[in-house]
Amino acid sequence: METRDLVIIGGGSAGMAAAISAFDNGVKDILILEKGEFLGGILNQCIHNGFGLHEFNEELTGPEFLTRFVNQIEQRRIEYKLNTYVLSLSQDKTISYVNRVDGMATIKAKSIIVATGCLERSAGAIEIPGERPSGVITAGQAQLYLNEYGYLVGKKVFILGSGDIGLIMARRMTLEGAKVLGVAELMPYSNGLNRNIQQCLKDFDIPLYLSHTVSKIIGKDKLEAIEVSEVDSSLKVIEGTARRFEVDTLLLSIGLIPNNALLNAIGAPQSKTRGSCVNEHMETSFDGLFACGNVLHVHDLVDYVVEEARVAGLGASKYLKGELIRGEHKILTEAGEGIGYVVPSQIDLDEAEDFIELKFRVKRPSKDVYIVYSCDGKIIKKV
């Protein structure tokens, strides 16, 4: 069986950044396994700008951003396999994969970084009443069809959910000649970045219906119309508030979830993000097995994905060199009131640097509040 020092599952921005970080910290035997036809992952279909402001101090499109990392991969001669689907991994770091060149194959790794990204929630996740006609599609899939294959999925469009992909597709569909009748958001606030609300909706006079949801899908074979209703504070549909929209396409932007199936299958403890629990090195509960990027928790900016992936790459290099200290003094992080989750889930005080970055997401927008860090009931910091 072939053995490699480091195998990275996923060749998107997280996988490439982790590989570059590990290489630059002394790991030369690296293999990236990527299921797609090209490196770069989701960035291949993100032809809009807004990437790289933190990483390069420039505003780049998705393909421009990923090309800079692909160039670094090529310069370092880091090996990668494309069109390669990983079937499973085991606790002893054995990976089974399949592709057209190798067929079904198995490889042993001394260390693994999982960077498999995230998935879109589909219509089945929210159980909208009505038929199941064609024309109901996730926003990311519509983006793929339009930006990579040149297919406009509809002419009269409504979007459910105000996530960033949905907002960006509202603008993209408008620019390509479709009529976007509106965006409905279940919550009383948008889940997208403020800049996307301004640039993608307000600049194009696309209405945003807060505290609304699609309450019915109409059409048997093809989508004919939808009903949009208000919801109350319990997120239940308010009877008598339905408005009918004649559309041929409903785009769903109803959330992303980590694509964590490989780690779940081997029993890696799961955090509130639906990703795996990790320490400050992005190492899971299994020694030498790391996770980073959207498979860990969904990021707003790819620049933040890259930062996190570098930590995982450095952690893997330390593990391979025997430099990771297994101390006895560990503390767990826990999300308090108003906070959805915290990453990392665990910090090793014997190994911790002077500065540890905690990443978290609030449950809802709030004003005039403090962020309080406490330990054993004592306030450490208040900002």
Give residue spans per PLM region:
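A Rossmann-like FAD-binding core segment of flavoenzymes
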Residues: R68-Y97, I107, T174-A261, D354-V383
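Rossmann-like nucleotide/phosphate-binding core characteristic of flavoprotein oxidoreductases
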Residues: M1-D5, L60, L82, S271, ...
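A conserved FAD-binding loop/helix module that cradles the flavin
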Residues: C292-E337
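Beta1-alpha1 glycine-rich phosphate/pyrophosphate-binding loop at the start
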Residues: R4-R68, L144, V153-Q199, K272, ...
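FAD-site-proximal beta/loop scaffold in flavoenzymes
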Residues: V136-L146, T249-H299
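FAD-binding core/adjacent interface of flavoenzyme oxidoreductases
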Residues: M1-I9, T67-K156, D232-G240, L251, ...
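Predominantly flavin-linked oxidoreductase catalytic cores and closely associated redox partners
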Residues: M104-A105, V114-L208, T213-K222, G288-A291, ...
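Short amphipathic alpha-helical segments
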Residues: A19-S21, N44-Q45, A125-I128, A170-R172, ...
